[in-house]
A protein has these predicted regions:
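Short loop/turn motifs that connect adjacent beta-strands in outer-membrane beta-barrel proteins
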Residues: 27-41, 81-88, 121-125, 129, ...
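Bacterial N-terminal signal peptides that target proteins for export
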Residues: 2-11
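Outer membrane beta-barrel
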Residues: 80-178, 205-207, 262, 291-315, ...
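Sec-dependent signal peptide cleavage junction
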Residues: 22-61, 204
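Hydrophobic, small-residue-rich alpha-helical packing segments that form membrane-like cores
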Residues: 153-238, 242-247, 252
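Exposed, low-structure sequence patches enriched in small/polar residues
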Residues: 46, 65, 72, 208-210, ...
Length: 572
């Protein structure tokens, strides 16, 4: 196999990073010095690589829509210096030939460089950060600058951050800067402040009785050019606001086993592509209650949001994953099993009512339901509905359609799942799951109607001895809609302390063409993982089904692919 010329830069860089790290294999065990050094260096390397990706017409892998280069990679190198008074760091990123899912028609992810550089000056009562940084106010309703590499999300802020702690239990933060959007910083200027006060630090009796009460408030301001030309129709130009302000207030209470969080946010008129350039305000309200005691856990949550899509650039495509200032958390369970995650929920910025409830109980050992080793049971239910008008766009330049506060619209998503964890012997344990799901594909994907699914999952782990562990899982998704039934199986052998071998297969239909789904297809994969100290490398080969990768209500479409994949991680 001939390595593509474009791969030489990445290969040389990758090997250069590995060589210093690999020297530790031959060194003696490190002994902690009696006195820690004044300055420490730590960091990490993460490199996801696909070698010689193959065209596979049966599953639509690497057709003319995507880069079919013989070498693809997303590589990240983080370095950080730490000392008593000053910390500093940076990140190198290489996505000149990005992995599947990071190739779009605008080549937004394509490139390489050092997008993140920062220095932090710190004392006991304050710290100041200059450069790039991440931040979140409250639950993220009005500000969440964070990184999620699997989704291609990195909206770090380039500017300044100041945090002051005037006394125990109090913290005040202020920020100002521009957010990253792919490889650029051509966004509106944002500034803001956040304050939190933990009253148990001031009231001794509360602290002694395990009572905690925290109140907080936040403000964010976005500035954009008010003279930008955006037309409401062929004859009318929109009068755009120069400033958009958002506010957040929250209360968090905890007493022994009970906890509660209430939060409310509001945003001034912010016409943008997400809301079809209407001028109504945005709001979000949330209440979360939880209880945990002696094997019993309870959770109840409700959230209402309307017009809370908050971007630092108003006139970008609606499906663009960048430019977000805030993050609206999804009140749905993030599933890790393949078929349970086949139809993931995407938070709707236009508005939604979201409800979630969960109950967990541990049946004690040597009881009728607990058996010899005990049994864990968890029941979870999530329901997301639209607002009164089901997110029908209002006319540009107006205040849009009015929604009554309490009235719900159509069901967007619901998920009822029961999970059971059971140990049968000292060597064998199992995890079982049943899930009922309703997925409104018309709302969440643009077309397709409602998809109703029943999903069955069994997962067993057999600890053969101290060195060998065998795990197997079987999954089946039963539905009369969309692409029909799916099946999935996996077998995984762990050989402690270094190796893990796995083979898996998904069986289902290929992606639709001209509205018609293809024939049944096997999405097979085989992988070997090697762990040594702080190093992990995985080499695999197989097919990947086209679908959505989601975390916390944020999703990215990943096209079908086939080829050799290499994943390397090193922390030092």
């Amino acid at each position: 196999m001939t390595i593509h010329p474009k791969a030489k830069l990445t290969f040389a860089f990758f090997v250069g990073c590995l060589l210093p790290a690999s020297q530790s294999f031959a060194q003696e065990e490190y002994t902690e010095p009696e006195q820690a050094p004044a300055v420490t260096l730590n960091g990490s390397i993460q490199s996801d690589i696909m070698v010689a990706p193959q065209t596979d017409a049966a599953i639509g892998a690497f057709d003319d829509s995507y880069d079919n280069s013989s070498f693809l990679t997303n590589t990240f190198v983080d370095l950080q210096l730490q000392s008593k008074w000053i910390d500093a760091g940076g990140r190198f990123e290489l996505k000149e030939w990005p992995m599947p899912g990071f190739q779009d028609k605008h080549n937004d992810f394509k490139g390489w460089g050092v997008p993140n550089l920062w220095a932090k000056f710190k004392t006991k009562v304050a710290d100041v950060t200059l450069g790039t940084f991440y931040e979140q106010f409250g639950s993220g309703f009005i500000l969440r600058a964070y990184e999620e590499r699997s989704l291609g999300v990195d909206n770090s802020i380039l500017g300044a951050r100041v945090a002051v702690r005037p006394f125990n239990g109090a913290q005040i933060k202020a920020i100002c800067g521009k957010q990253r959007a792919y490889w650029d910083w051509d966004t509106g200027l944002i500034s803001g402040a956040d304050a939190e006060l933990s009253l148990e630090e001031l009231i001794t009796k509360w602290s002694e009785s395990n009572t905690h009460l925290t109140i907080g408030g936040s403000w964010i301001n976005k500035r954009e050019d008010p003279d930008e030309t955006i037309m409401a129709d062929v004859t009318h130009k929109l009068n755009l606001p120069e400033f958009v302000n958002a506010f957040d207030a929250r209360v968090r209470f905890q007493k022994n086993d009970f906890a509660a969080l209430a939060e409310y946010a509001q945003k001034s008129a912010d016409p943008n592509t997400l809301n079809n350039f209407i001028y109504s305000k945005g709001t979000a309200a949330m209440l979360s209650l939880s209880y945990s005691h002696t094997g019993l856990s309870l959770l109840a949550q409700v959230k209402r949001s309307e017009n809370m899509g908050f971007r630092n650039k108003r006139n970008v495509p609606e499906d663009c994953s960048a430019y977000y200032i805030n993050h609206m958390p999804a009140f749905t369970l993030d599933h890790t099993y393949t078929l349970a995650a086949l139809y993931p929920y995407v938070t709707q910025s236009e508005g939604e009512w979201a409800y979630q409830g969960a109950i967990g109980y541990n049946f004690k050992r040597k009881t009728a339901l607990g058996g010899r080793y005990g049994t864990k049971l968890k029941l979870n239910y999530s329901l997301v509905k639209g607002l009164e008008n089901n997110n029908i766009d209002g006319k540009s330049g107006t205040e849009g359609l009015k929604n009554s506060f309490f009235k719900n619209g159509d069901i967007y998503y619901q998920d009822l799942n029961l999970q059971i964890d059971k140990r049968f012997t000292k060597q064998f344990e199992g995890h079982f799951m049943y899930m009922y799901q309703q997925f409104n594909k018309t709302i969440l994907r643009g077309e397709g109607g409602n998809i109703y699914s029943n999903i069955f999952i069994g997962d067993g782990k057999w600890t053969i001895n101290d060195r060998f562990t065998l795990r197997a899982e079987a999954q089946y998704l039963l539905t009369e809609h969309e692409s029909g039934d799916w099946g999935c199986g996996l077998v995984e052998l762990s050989v402690a302390p270094y190796f893990m071998f796995s083979v898996s297969d998904q069986i289902g239909r290929t992606e639709p063409k001209n509205g018609i789904y293809g024939e049944k297809a096997h999405y097979y994969n085989a992988a070997i993982t090697f762990d040594y100290k702080a190093h992990r490398i995985m080499v695999g080969y197989g097919r990947t089904r086209a679908g959505y990768n989601c975390t916390g209500g944020v999703c990215r479409f990943v096209p079908a692919s086939k080829g050799i994949t290499i994943n390397y991680n090193y922390n030092f």
